[in-house]
Amino acid sequence: MEQFTVQLNNATCTVCIGAGVLGRAGALLRQHVPQVRRWALAADEAVSAFYGEWVQGSLRAAGLESRLFLLPQGESAKTPEAWVSLCRRILDSGFDRSCGVVTLGGGACGDAAGFAAASLLRGVPLAHIPTTLLA
C-alpha cells in the first residue's frame, strides 16, 4: 500500500492506494481520524451490493461502529431530495458531532455525502473510499 499526504490551505489529506486497502478501511480510519468511533457509511446502491458488508466488517474489526446509508446511483444522488433524505436518515439514527461520514462509491456519491458531512451539525469529519478513477 502506498500513502502520501496532500497539503491544502488549512488541512492535510492522506491518500492510501494499493491492494488490500478496502479490507483495511477500519484500521486506516482509526489511524487517521482517531477521534471518530461511529461512522455513517454513505454508499452508492450498486457499489454497496459488492463492498458494503466488506467495509462494515473492516470497521467492526477495528472497533468502530457504522451504519449503512444507501444513495441512488450516479447523478441522481446529487438532487436536493436525495441530500435531504440522507441528512434526515443520519440525524434520525442518532448521529452527532462526534461521528463522521465515510463515502463508498463514485464521484456523485462522494459529492452528495461530502456535502452532507459539511452541512450536518456544522460539519463532521469526512473520509472517502472512491471506487472510480474520477472520484
State where each predicted segment sits.
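ATP/NTP phosphate-donor binding region
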Residues: 1-100
